[in-house]
């Protein structure tokens, strides 16, 4: 059994075209044929699959409640948990700089890899098989999730925390966009102010402006130990 066979057993899916899996595991720092286009595809499929599951699971919930639960299930920390369960860091191809910086442990890289694998599965055997695999991955998470305040996304939780402390709201600014139009990486700066002075600046990246802003807000929540 080779190392990719072991990974296939962990994710519960066997590829017909193993080259798709190899590409899904390849970070942009390692090769020109990397996983960002697959990540773009997988992100959309994951959002649809989880939205459909929640729609049927919670027939009495309104759009806002469903959206918050979906955001919880598809956000970066949740995907990173799945990635660690699969031990994806042991299988990824990263450039030397990312390896030295511990990229195989970074939540954003792990989360992106999960989405890329989803995209690769859809190209390999289609949507029906892929959505079933995703549902298998999320079986316990879907069973445990419930509507409520704890489902609010990171930006909302940070905003409510600052408002409760009568502090200015954070500002988000896109400071860099890399890549071609179909697979861009956004870098966002989030500044948190207190009493008119800038206290901290946090920087995060994502495959969309929304993802980068959420990742920056998540960093601040962790720093401030806000649940």
From Swiss-Prot:
It catalyses: Endonucleolytic cleavage to 5'-phosphomonoester. CDD domains: DSRM_RNAse_III_family (cd10845), RIBOc (cd00593). It comes from the Bacteria. SUPFAM superfamilies: dsRNA-binding domain-like (SSF54768), RNase III domain-like (SSF69065). Residues 4-126 form the RNase III domain. One of its GO terms (cellular component) is cytoplasm. Its EC number is 3.1.26.3. Residues 153-226 form the DRBM domain. GO terms for molecular function: double-stranded RNA binding; metal ion binding; ribonuclease III activity; rRNA binding. The active site is at residues 43, 115. GO terms for biological process: mRNA processing; regulation of gene expression; rRNA processing; tRNA processing. Mg(2+) binds at residues 39, 112, 115. InterPro entries: dsRBD_dom, RNase_III, RNase_III_dom, RNase_III_sf. The keyword rRNA processing applies. Homodimer. Belongs to the ribonuclease III family. This is Ribonuclease 3. It comes from Haemophilus influenzae (strain PittEE).
């Amino acid at each position: 059994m080779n190392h990719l066979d072991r990974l296939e057993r962990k994710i519960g899916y066997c590829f017909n075209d193993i080259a798709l899996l190899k590409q899904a595991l390849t970070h942009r720092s390692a090769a020109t044929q990397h996983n960002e286009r697959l990540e773009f595809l997988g992100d959309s499929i994951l959002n649809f699959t989880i939205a459909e599951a929640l729609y049927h699971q919670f027939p009495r919930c309104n759009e806002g409640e469903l959206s918050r639960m979906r955001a919880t299930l598809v956000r970066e920390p949740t995907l990173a948990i799945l990635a660690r369960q699969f031990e994806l860091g042991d299988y990824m191809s990263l450039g030397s700089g990312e390896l030295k910086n511990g990229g195989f442990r970074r939540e954003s890289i792990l989360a992106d890899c999960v989405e890329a694998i989803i995209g690769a599965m859809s190209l390999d055997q289609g949507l029906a098989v892929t959505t079933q695999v995703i549902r298998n991955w999320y079986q316990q998470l879907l069973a445990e999730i419930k509507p409520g305040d704890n489902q609010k996304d990171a930006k909302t939780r940070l905003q409510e925390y600052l408002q409760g402390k009568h502090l200015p709201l954070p500002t988000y600014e896109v400071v860099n966009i890399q890549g071609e139009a179909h697979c861009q990486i956004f870098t966002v700066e989030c500044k948190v102010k207190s009493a008119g002075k800038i206290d901290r600046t946090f920087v995060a990246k994502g495959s969309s402006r929304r993802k980068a802003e959420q990742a920056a807000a998540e960093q601040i929540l962790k720093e401030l130990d806000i649940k």
